[in-house]
Regions:
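Catalytic center-proximal scaffold of phosphoryl-transfer enzymes
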Residues: 1-304
């Protein structure tokens, strides 16, 4: 109680299901105390390294951040998920949206409200704890936040980097809205075809597609006005757009796992009550909540 739902909800649930009278404040204190204990004992839990070693598939590190209201104002809680995932069936740029990506064989979440440099050290330390076999075997996936790629370069030099394909597509959608302002259906169709070009040939594919479609664009001046911003952004990530080769190998090209974690751990649980949280309490609680959705949860409690 208090992990997936508010402490007040936990109080009501315990009373309804077990007839126990435990107030929300007690549940809050116990949850935070156990979360802090769980983080302190992390170094003693060696089973996670064994799980990663035995897990079949490719290594991923997905990174993102979410906003949390703290006693010092709104802060970024940075979250990273290490995972090993078996490859999906090989597919092309035309049918990748329909492919079924296997669930991770194993995953592990870390979090921190701290500068990116410090969080990078946390990620590096965790990679060592779970026995990352070699940096070159790792793929780092994320959106366009500069701190993510600085972290990747500084702490995991040699790892493959992948810009989330759906994040990149949002920029293509901006172009479409500019060129098809009065035609939402046409805008959507154009975005889909632009995404196919992006996935097939990266930034070069986008350039060719935009050039070829200009004569048919209803509002060409607006698209041309919007293009420099999109070009400046996407061209800076062209080395992170090896989507076609990754699809051929059955690898991930999106960071949906970490975005889902942010939505579940931060958006749904941390923000749902509108409470202001103590900065020192957030990171251990986010990690503790995530533990509850993995096989580590049972192992953690069985060791008590």
């Amino acid at each position: 109680m208090g992990i997936d739902n508010s402490f007040e909800r936990g109080e009501r649930t315990l009373n309804e299901l077990a007839g126990w009278s435990v107030d929300a404040e007690t549940i809050r204190r116990l949850c935070h105390a156990e979360a802090a204990k769980c983080r302190r004992s992390k170094g003693q839990r060696l089973d996670i390294a064994t799980r990663f070693e035995k897990a079949p598939g490719d290594w991923e590190l997905q990174i993102d951040a979410g906003k949390v209201n703290t006693e010092t104002g709104w802060r970024d809680v940075k979250v990273a998920t290490f995972a090993v995932r078996e490859p999906a069936e090989s597919c092309s740029s035309e049918d990748f949206a329909q492919r079924e990506l296997p669930r991770p064989s194993v995953r592990h979440v870390i979090a921190g409200i701290e500068p990116a440099e410090q969080f990078g050290l946390r990620c590096q330390s965790e990679a060592q704890r779970i026995d990352l076999p070699a940096v070159k075997s790792l793929t780092i996936l994320g959106d366009g936040a500069e701190w993510i790629w600085n972290l990747a370069h500084d702490r995991f030099s040699g790892a493959q980097q992948n810009l989330d394909v759906y994040h990149a597509t949002q920029y293509l959608a901006d172009l479409a809205r500019a060129g098809f302002a009065a035609e939402p259906k046409a805008s959507q169709d154009w975005t889909g075809r632009a995404q196919t070009a992006l996935v097939a040939d990266g930034w070069a594919g986008v350039c060719a597609f935009v050039h070829e479609s200009l004569p048919q664009m209803p509002d060409r001046p607006s698209l041309e006005a919007a293009y420099p911003r999109v070009a400046n952004y996407l061209s800076g990530h062209q080395d992170r757009m090896q989507y076609a080769s990754r699809l051929h190998r059955g690898a991930s090209i999106g960071s949906g796992m970490i975005e889902g974690a942010i939505k579940q751990l931060v958006g749904r649980r941390i923000k749902q009550t509108g409470a202001r949280w103590k900065t020192d309490s957030i990171s251990p609680l986010v990690e503790f909540i995530s533990l509850g959705h993995t096989e580590e949860w049972d192992t953690y409690w069985s060791a008590m």
